Amino acid sequence: MKSAPAALRARGLVKRYGHVTALAAADIGLRPGEILAVIGDNGAGKSSLIKALSGALRPEAGEIWLDGAPVQFRSPIDARRAGIETVYQDLAVAPAMTIAENLFLGRELRRPGVLGRLGMIGKRRMLEGCMAWMSALGVDIRSMAQRVETLSGGQRQCVAVARAAAFARHVVMMDEPTAALGVREGNMVLDLIRRVRERGLSVILVSHNMPHVFEVADRIHIARLGRRVAVVDPRKISMGDTVAVMTGVQDPGELPPHVLA
């Protein structure tokens, strides 16, 4: 059976911090329109992998392809220009600004100026655009004109995810998007992640929350000691066996072929 082409693929990524190897010839393959969960213990290289794919760090070795073409990201700006958006744990939202202003942060819409110069920021256009986009994603927040500092943790996370999805053309990567959220707000974010996928974007989801991983992931990438040890189908493997492989209790080579993905 022919495998699906990769939307984003990396092979042999290496990154060291002094005597510590964060990425030890790490590989990853993300298929078009899927949610790929990346799991692993602390020190497995999950965050370093995301940073390498988003241009936040430059690996010492290895290759990255986007839609089949080789790419090199010298900075996060390069990755964003290529259509990859990333939501880190700090969210990078401005609490004192409105939801609409945060959605367009760094990409503000401006009114035409005199003699071709940049005009004033078009706040009304941004507000209208934000309302339309949030409605399309099913994000239920009372007013897009309210400040982010008035929102709950789950709502802030939704703003960050929606902003990434608004400008991504290929891939959205998320680092622990449901961390420290309660059940209701965690489910709200998971629903949004599903809707992002439904709009045709591929998603990489880094998470320690195994129930959340098994709820939304199409495939699970298991990392250990800086490299990929297995990719499994959450519909065919138990959570317990997945954790056993992740922690090194079970040899990934002993997994039955039908659970691999």
Model-derived features with residue positions:
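Glycine-rich phosphate-binding loops of nucleotide-dependent enzymes
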Residues: 2-261
